Every structure is written in C-alpha cells, then in structure tokens.
Amino acid sequence: MLSLGFSLPPPSDNKLIITNNNQYNYRTNLANVCSNNNVNAVGDQLVTLPEGLKHVAVIMDGHRRWAKNKGLTVKQGHRAGGEKIQVLTRLCSQWGVKVLTIFAFSTENWVRLEEEVDFLMKLFLELIGSQEILDEWTRDGRRVSFIGDKSIFSKSLQEALAVMEERTKFNSGLHVIIAINYSGRQDILQATKSIAIKVKNGDLTVKDIDQSLFEQELDTHCTEFSEPDLLIRTSGEKRVSNFMLWQLAYTELYFANKLFPDMEEADFIEALTSFKSRQRRYGGKKI
C-alpha cells in the first residue's frame, strides 16, 4: 500500500468515451492484460457502466516486490505505484464513481525501515504540499479528505493536509479519501471512546446508540457513501489488512494477481466491471 499520486497523466488514445446510452466506448489494445483476469479481447470494446458502484476502495500492494523484481529501489517502486493511482483516479472520475478511498499508509507501516518511512513522509509532503497539484485538483473539481491519526506527522505535513482539505472541500467531483496512518481497529476504537465520552457527559444516552450514530463517529463520516461497494487489492494477497473493518461488512472484494505498479488501465477496468456480475444480498435472499 504505501504510494500516493495526484497529478493526472495527459490524455491518450487509450481512454473511455461516454455515449448517450450510459455506456463507455473503450478503445485500447487489451492484449497485454493478464490472462488470470480473463481479458483477451483486442480492439474496440463496449463497456457498460456498473450500476450502484458509488464507492471504490483500493489496497495498493506490491511496490517493494515490484522494485526488487526489476532491480530498482523501494523508492522507485513507490513512485511507480503513484503513477498508477493517477490512472485509477481518472477512471473513477470518468465513470462517475462518487468516492475513491486509497489506503496509502497504515499504522503498522511504521515498522518498515526508517529510510523507507522517511522517504514516504517526504513524498507525501512533496505531493500534498505542491501548489501545482493543489491548483490542478481544485480546477478539476475533486474533493480530498484524509482519514487516520494525523497527529503523529510533522507540523508541515499536517498543515499541508489541512490546506488540501480546506481548498477542495466544496468541490463536487470525485471525492478522494486518503487513509494515512490509518487502522480499521483504531477507527472503531476511537468512535467507541467518543460515544462513551458523550454518554458520560450527558450528551447521549445508551438508548441513543445505534449503527447510524456509530457511523457518524467513524473517520469515514466525511462522505455520504461511507461503505465501499468494491474493494480492489493487488499482488495476489487475499486479506483486508486492518482496513475499514466496519465499513467493509458488505463490500464486494476483487483480488488482482498483478503487483500494483504493474496494473494498467485495462486491469482497473476489468476490476471495476467485475462489479456488474456481483449479486449483493446483504444477508437476505436474492431480489
């Protein structure tokens, strides 16, 4: 997980074009898509928008392995992953997805080598504190929120996070939520403590506590669509790794075998369109 990218790449011939019948005409060469994703078409392909896909979450996994496989540094692996986040962000915007949540840095990642962690903190500050990137995201109408315990970061990084949120808070385009120093367990714990304090102070009673109230205390209260419809995880790992444990209760899961920096536009499209085949029952019978 551990990489982050904001600046969008220039337009290319490999793009999605919206049409009047709520479909995208996707023109690209799909021959390079990995066979385990069952994509083997080449040429024009008509891709229908998945209904009900409002919130997509992603666990970016495989940056260090990717770098090792190519004889590159871990730093280069994280930068390569940041470029692929740009691709996914653009796709989600074009498809009309409302929310994209990116697991950028977990509370467990502090155990990584000090050199790697220091680089990531500098990379976050470089990207988030960039006036060029801030202007671009403001211009493109994207809203940015950060969830997780930000108090541990340097003052300069905390200020950059606050400026990014403040400058984009009224934007109505894709809402990008970046989980940084985030833990699903800690999110539940802090919400529980917050409610307990309110009960102790007389602001709430025990009878007032229900799922809706609890969700208002979670970090994801910053969005109307707090529960992801689809979670994408790369590198072949099949676990959620302490990410959004409450919010993922009914989320559809998609596991890609490719390492995150190896993911191409067509791979992300395959992941997003997989949502069309899911039957979401929420514990009940198929409707």
Curated annotation (Swiss-Prot):
Its EC number is 2.5.1.-. Expressed in leaf trichomes and stem trichomes. It is found in: Plastid, Chloroplast. GO terms for biological process: plastid membrane organization; polyprenol biosynthetic process; response to cold. One of its GO terms (cellular component) is chloroplast. HAMAP family: ISPT. This is Cis-prenyltransferase 7, chloroplastic. It comes from Solanum lycopersicum. The gene is CPT7.
